[in-house]
């Protein structure tokens, strides 16, 4: 059986930057998980004493706080700055961009449509920078019964599929007089999604490695599953089952943006140890 890695996979720029920052700072607390990968979070806690707090209210005697890659709300940032604590911002620049856009567009009188999951920390943070009105949607149908203003700005959660974002944009263009469209989908998302699409079309089994609470990993899995029925989403090599690979000829592997290479290599090694001819 051939084992092939996607052309683009794993750690993105923002995650690499955050991990490096956490390793250098040490002995700190993150507000929410730094990234959506439980194994890497555990490694940072064990080796660098970087612990994860649920929210700002959980801070007690910590001297250093790291803002997660997904960012935090504007209100939480203001609250954090009032505390006697050193702040290190690990928000991904691709996430900071829609925050800034929302703030500026609001000042110019635009209401904002955010394409994304309203429960995702990134989207909560982005929405908090809107001072007019924000509409968080996952489908154009959610906009059909809303009385839209004449001026709308549109941004996307960084990990969404571009074609779905365009469905929202095309709907709005027909419904309102002025639409400002900002492509806030991350470059790494484009590349990883294109790569897994290509690989899954020629594979008869696919393994996607990453946190099951990771939005970008779940998107990769959905793309793989669309093209390859026998697709599996795992967090560690312990979840692999030999029967997945029996009678298979081509195994494709991809990984979410928060998945470190050391986990991916363990997955590959275990599949190789199954010795599937």
Swiss-Prot record:
- Catalytic activity, per the record? isopentenyl diphosphate + 2 oxidized [2Fe-2S]-[ferredoxin] + H2O = (2E)-4-hydroxy-3-methylbut-2-enyl diphosphate + 2 reduced [2Fe-2S]-[ferredoxin] + 2 H(+); dimethylallyl diphosphate + 2 oxidized [2Fe-2S]-[ferredoxin] + H2O = (2E)-4-hydroxy-3-methylbut-2-enyl diphosphate + 2 reduced [2Fe-2S]-[ferredoxin] + 2 H(+)
Q: How is the cofactor bound?
A: Binds 1 [4Fe-4S] cluster per subunit.
Which keywords does UniProt give here?
Answer: 4Fe-4S, Iron, Iron-sulfur, Isoprene biosynthesis, Metal-binding, Oxidoreductase
Give the positions the UniProt entry annotates as the active site. Answer: 122
Q: Name one GO biological process term.
A: isopentenyl diphosphate biosynthetic process, methylerythritol 4-phosphate pathway
The record's GO molecular-function terms, alphabetically, read: 4 iron, 4 sulfur cluster binding; 4-hydroxy-3-methylbut-2-enyl diphosphate reductase activity; metal ion binding
What this protein needs as a cofactor is: [4Fe-4S] cluster
List where the protein spans the membrane. Answer: none
UniProt-annotated binding residues for [4Fe-4S] cluster? 12, 92, 186
- Its top-level enzyme class, in one word, is oxidoreductase
Oxidoreductase among keywords: yes
Residues the entry annotates as binding dimethylallyl diphosphate: 36, 70, 120, 214, 216, 258
Reading the lineage from the top rank, the first entry is Bacteria
Q: Which positions are annotated as binding (2E)-4-hydroxy-3-methylbut-2-enyl diphosphate? A: 36, 70, 120, 158, 214, 216, 258
The pathway that the record names for this protein is: Isoprenoid biosynthesis; dimethylallyl diphosphate biosynthesis; dimethylallyl diphosphate from (2E)-4-hydroxy-3-methylbutenyl diphosphate: step 1/1; Isoprenoid biosynthesis; isopentenyl diphosphate biosynthesis via DXP pathway; isopentenyl diphosphate from 1-deoxy-D-xylulose 5-phosphate: step 6/6
InterPro entries, alphabetized = LytB/IspH
Which CDD domains does the UniProt record give?
Answer: lytB_ispH (cd13944)
Q: What EC identifiers does the entry list?
A: 1.17.7.4
Residues bound to isopentenyl diphosphate are: 36, 70, 120, 214, 216, 258
Mitochondrion as a keyword of this entry, yes or no, is no
Cysteine pairs bridged by disulfides in the record: none
Query: What function does this protein fulfil?
Result: Catalyzes the conversion of 1-hydroxy-2-methyl-2-(E)-butenyl 4-diphosphate (HMBPP) into a mixture of isopentenyl diphosphate (IPP) and dimethylallyl diphosphate (DMAPP). Acts in the terminal step of the DOXP/MEP pathway for isoprenoid precursor biosynthesis.
Q: Which family would the database say this protein is a member of? A: Belongs to the IspH family.
* Name of the molecule in the record: 4-hydroxy-3-methylbut-2-enyl diphosphate reductase
Task: Tell me what organism the protein belongs to.
Answer: Campylobacter jejuni subsp. jejuni serotype O:2 (strain ATCC 700819 / NCTC 11168)
């Amino acid at each position: 059986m051939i084992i092939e890695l996607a052309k683009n996979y794993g750690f993105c720029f923002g995650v690499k930057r955050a991990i490096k920052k956490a390793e250098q700072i040490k002995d700190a607390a993150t507000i929410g998980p730094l990234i959506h990968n439980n194994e890497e979070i555990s490694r940072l806690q064990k080796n660098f004493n970087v612990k994860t707090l649920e929210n700002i209210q959980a801070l007690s005697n910590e001297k250093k706080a790291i803002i997660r890659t997904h960012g935090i709300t504007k209100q939480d940032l203001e609250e954090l700055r009032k505390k006697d604590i050193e702040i290190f911002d690990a928000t991904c620049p691709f996430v900071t961009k829609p925050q800034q856009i929302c703030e500026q567009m609001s000042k110019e009188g635009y209401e904002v449509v955010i394409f994304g999951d309203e429960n995702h920390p990134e989207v909560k943070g982005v929405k908090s920078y809107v001072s007019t009105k924000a509409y968080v949607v996952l489908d154009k149908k959610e906009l059909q019964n809303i009385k839209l203003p004449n001026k709308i700005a549109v941004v996307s959660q960084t990990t969404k599929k571009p074609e779905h974002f365009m469905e929202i944009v095309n709907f709005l263009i027909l419904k309102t007089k002025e639409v400002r469209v900002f492509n806030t989908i991350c470059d790494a998302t484009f590349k990883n999604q294109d790569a897994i699409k290509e690989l899954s079309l020629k594979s008869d089994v696919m393994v996607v490695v990453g946190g099951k609470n990771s939005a970008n990993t779940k998107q990769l899995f959905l793309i793989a599953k669309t093209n390859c029925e026998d697709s599996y989403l795992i967090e560690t090599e312990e979840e692999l089952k030999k029967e997945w690979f029996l009678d298979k000829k081509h195994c494709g592997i991809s990984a979410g943006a928060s998945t470190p290479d050391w986990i991916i290599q363990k997955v590959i090694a275990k599949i190789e140890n199954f010795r599937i001819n």
